[in-house]
Amino acid sequence: MYALLREAFFLVESGYATIEDVDRSLRNDFGYWITFAGPFRYMDLTGIPAYETVMRDLLPDLCRSTEVPRLISDVVKSDAQGVANARGFYKYTRASARRWEKRFLEFTYDIRALALKYPGDSRERVGARLRARKRVGR
């Protein structure tokens, strides 16, 4: 959680994104699935190898480590792809992997509908954007 917050502050303070941009991006990605699954289950559901690939390029910019975490490399080397081949951070049978895929898809549609029911207040969004611009000297 705090690593996420640190990166959010860095993006805003460095002028890469506004507070609204960061909040929207998290809400429209992280916020959709985090109440359904933790990060390891999510990678199982969405395809583990892609995360390793992105980590190779992204981690040097996020922290001092230039290494992909050993855990994900070991999982990828074992040919695990998550629910796609019923092998990932969690153990699956083919049937349980398909059930997880189906549940994830249903949840995704349900949570999107719920999120649309509670849009952010437009005045808050404009205020956040203005405050972020002032902080970065725009």
Predicted regions and their residues:
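NAD(P)-dependent Rossmann-like dehydrogenase/reductase catalytic/cofactor-binding core
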Residues: 13-14, 19-138
